Amino acid sequence: MCLDDKQQGMVFNIQKYSVHDGPGIRTIVFLKGCSLSCRWCSNPESQKSCAELACNPGRCIDISKCGHCLTACPHGAITCGDDDKPRIDRSHCADCSIPCAEVCPAQGLLVYGKKRAVGDVLRVVEQDMAFYARSGGGLTLSGGEPLLQGSFAVALLREARARRIRTAVETCGMVPADTVREAAPHLSYVLYDIKHMNSEIHETQTGLPNARILENFRILAEEFPHLPILARTPVIPGFNDNEKAVAAIARFIKAYPHVNYELLPYHRLGTQKYHFLGREVPMGEVSLNKAVTDGLQKTALDILGERVQIPR
């Protein structure tokens, strides 16, 4: 089948040389859009499905020395702040993004998200074929929720496999079941987030209940039993950082012998991007005690044994 390069998706980053998002050395393609609104999200720029204008004031050379962005914005959404840096009025900004960011010589204004074709993305991915061959790596789709852009994600996976590239997806599972079934035959590996087994608690911190997430996990595990799955739980203070929550997830996973499990300690690496987007950091200054994570690792090990992976 010929590649239809008219198939496009909204991509906000392509990251090379990753060793934490699937086996071997991988290239991660980040797609925009997610149905969940997790308070701890480290990629806030991934949540909306459209391109977004952001401001990194540390790169701005000062409005008084430049000011191109003030006149470039067709909506009058950019003004000069007291610190001589741009201020974006989000109530007026249409996220057309391009005029303001294009005229910024220092990249103080930047755009998260760009329409890219399947072939364009895979040309970047193919640059590291030698690394994939030696390490067992390949392409990982991430986000956001990559399967929310269902047809584009499946087209990427299908074409990657046709080019002998191993494929993986990082998913929260909050997508239509048909999309899961369509993507699965083109996957070599799945990283699947299970955040909480209690649907009401899940909804308080992510915005949605978990029934669809758990059902899609069952679909993958039962209908595609030869597909390796790594279930992952981000350990979040005040949400699931307790033995009861982790034990419930581990017991759920135990029914599927080909599924491994990993706990991901909470971190604050994405906080700066919230500021770039003019948003408050939902989690504030909270942190996770390492002793808590170590205790929860033991809880998981007691239930799943060697199927528990310790983060590198």
From Swiss-Prot:
Residues annotated as binding [4Fe-4S] cluster 2: C60, C66, C69, C104
Gene3D superfamilies tied to this protein: 3.30.70.20, pyruvate-formate lyase- activating enzyme
GO molecular function: 4 iron, 4 sulfur cluster binding; metal ion binding; oxidoreductase activity
Residue ranges annotated for the 4Fe-4S ferredoxin-type domain, each copy included: 51-83, 84-115
Annotated [4Fe-4S] cluster 3 binding sites: C73, C93, C96, C100
Induction (UniProt): Highly up-regulated in the presence of isethionate.
Domain of life, per lineage: Bacteria
Necessary cofactors: [4Fe-4S] cluster
Catalytic class of the enzyme: oxidoreductase
Entry's EC annotation: 1.97.1.-
Biological pathway: Organosulfur degradation; alkanesulfonate degradation
Record has Metal-binding as a keyword: yes
Catalytic activity: glycyl-[protein] + reduced [flavodoxin] + S-adenosyl-L-methionine = glycin-2-yl radical-[protein] + semiquinone [flavodoxin] + 5'-deoxyadenosine + L-methionine + H(+)
Gene Ontology biological process terms, A to Z: alkanesulfonate catabolic process
Annotated S-adenosyl-L-methionine binding sites: W40, C41, S42, G144, D193, I194, K195, H267
InterPro entries: 4Fe4S_Fe-S-bd, BssD/PflA/YjjW, Organic_radical-activating, Organic_radical_activase, Radical_activat_CS, rSAM
Family that this chain belongs to: Belongs to the organic radical-activating enzymes family.
Oligomeric and partner information: Monomer.
Its job: Involved in an anaerobic respiration pathway that converts the sulfonate isethionate (2-hydroxyethanesulfonate) to ammonia, acetate and sulfide. Catalyzes activation of the isethionate sulfite-lyase IslA under anaerobic conditions by generation of an organic free radical on a glycine residue, via a homolytic cleavage of S-adenosyl-L-methionine (SAM).
Protein name, per record: Isethionate sulfite-lyase activating enzyme
Organism: Desulfovibrio desulfuricans (strain ATCC 27774 / DSM 6949 / MB)
Gene name of the record: islB
